């Protein structure tokens, strides 16, 4: 299903509460929130006013999601203040924005952060700067502010009328299934312990710091499903579990996700807290919008929202950016020494003049999967039923 059709079907369902089976309750009242499409779609028509003035800046950052905000944070933290961040929407945050109601703040999208491992040095330094991480950010197991560590039960699976802890199916699993579970996790552990000749872990975050051993890179040539079958793992509930993980992280079936990517999902999140465990995550009522807001506060005066970058042109000594200011209905031309492009990749061919054909083809080939976060306000406590509370 195309993203547009998916969103329209949700909107239609929300608008037709009376059109349902008499035996089933209708959808509760609510809103479908997301990116404002109209402003971005102006890139197709190119009907922007000519620039009314020209300004100078050292670094221009295109996009105010977590990537753009963290780039700005890094520059600012390093003592470099000659930058400007441009965000299409009325608020920064991108997929890490949030809303509020009478009960609580709630995330629109990204809603937790796995504990960063030792390779994620910049992430740890960011968390230390924001007061989330206490003490040495490069300790093997740093101390985190316990207000932000998720101690509550994180995942539940409803199977055969019973709630169980975790997502790996246990209720109804046969002895053969359990044996294959053990073999699968033993296999993961062998990869977890593997190191390259120069000491890199097999799978790390950032991914660029993962081992480049040919044996591991060859895993990118077969699917995660094929990899499992190659190792004699054909348990149906085990395949369901792995497929769930691939759909969650990549938006695709484990028969389409490469074995390298599938293993990276299971093995790259290895951060620990001195005052917690490796299964915990960092989270806030508003999700990762908390991180976005905390970063922006440090350089708010250098952020422009409702600012659509519709042209980027590179010259020998500078880069030109034409920025449409929606609130003022005018275009400002910026001349920058450097540009950090932190907007979605598919936008590149629409804004960069004379984009290299290989980059254009690569950007056009990127596919995105729809991702919906549902926030529910409950009128009364849930009835847990049988199984794990």
Please provide the spans of the model-predicted regions:
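Extreme N-terminal leader/targeting segments of oxidoreductases
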Residues: 2-58, 77
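Conserved hydrophobic helix-helix packing surfaces used for dimerization/oligomerization
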Residues: 59-61, 83
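Glycine-rich Rossmann-fold phosphate-binding loop(s) that bind the pyrophosphate
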Residues: 63-65
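N-terminal Rossmann-fold NAD(P) dinucleotide-binding loop
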Residues: 68
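Glycine-rich FAD pyrophosphate-binding loop
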Residues: 76-99
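Dinucleotide-binding Rossmann-like beta1-alpha1 core, especially the glycine-rich loop
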Residues: 103-191
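Active-site/ligand-binding neighborhood in enzyme catalytic cores
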Residues: 193-318, 335
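Mid-domain catalytic core of redox enzymes
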Residues: 305-389
């Amino acid at each position: 299903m195309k993203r547009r059709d998916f969103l329209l079907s949700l909107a239609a369902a929300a608008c037709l509460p009376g059109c349902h089976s008499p035996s089933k309750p209708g959808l509760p009242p609510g809103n479908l929130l997301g990116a404002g499409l109209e402003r971005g779609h102006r890139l197709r028509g190119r009907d922007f006013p000519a620039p009314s003035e020209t300004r100078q800046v050292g670094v221009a950052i295109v996009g105010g999601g977590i990537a753009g905000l963290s780039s700005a944070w890094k520059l600012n933290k390093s003592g470099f203040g000659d930058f400007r961040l441009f965000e299409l929407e009325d608020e920064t945050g991108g997929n890490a924005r949030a809303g509020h109601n009478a009960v609580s703040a709630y995330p629109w999208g990204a809603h937790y952060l796995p504990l960063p491992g030792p390779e994620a040095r910049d992430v740890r330094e960011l968390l230390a700067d924001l007061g989330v991480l206490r003490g040495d950010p490069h300790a093997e197991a740093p101390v985190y502010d316990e207000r932000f560590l998720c101690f509550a039960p994180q995942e539940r699976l409803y199977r055969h009328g019973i709630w169980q802890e975790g997502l790996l199916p246990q209720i109804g699993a046969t002895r053969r299934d359990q044996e294959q579970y053990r073999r699968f996790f033993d296999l993961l552990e062998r990869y977890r312990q593997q190191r390259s000749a120069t000491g890199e872990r097999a799978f790390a975050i950032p991914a660029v710091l993962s081992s480049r051993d040919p044996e591991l890179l060859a895993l990118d040539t077969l699917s995660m499903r094929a990899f499992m079958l190659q190792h004699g793992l054909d348990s149906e509930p085990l395949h369901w579990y792995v497929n769930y993980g691939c759909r969650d992280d990549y938006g695709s079936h484990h028969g389409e996700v490469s074995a390298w990517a599938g293993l990276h999902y299971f093995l790259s999140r290895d951060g620990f807290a001195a005052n917690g465990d490796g299964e915990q995550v960092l989270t806030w009522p508003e999700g990762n919008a908390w991180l976005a807001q905390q970063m922006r506060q440090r350089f708010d005066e250098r952020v422009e929202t409702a600012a659509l970058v519709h042209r980027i042109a590179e010259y020998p000594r500078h880069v030109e950016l034409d920025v449409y200011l929606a609130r003022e209905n005018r275009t400002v031309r910026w001349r920058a020494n450097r540009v950090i492009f932190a907007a979605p990749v598919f936008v590149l061919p629409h804004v960069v003049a004379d984009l290299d054909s290989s980059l254009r083809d690569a950007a056009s080939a990127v596919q995105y999967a729809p991702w919906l976060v549902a926030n529910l306000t409950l009128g009364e406590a849930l009835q847990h039923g049988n199984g794990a509370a």
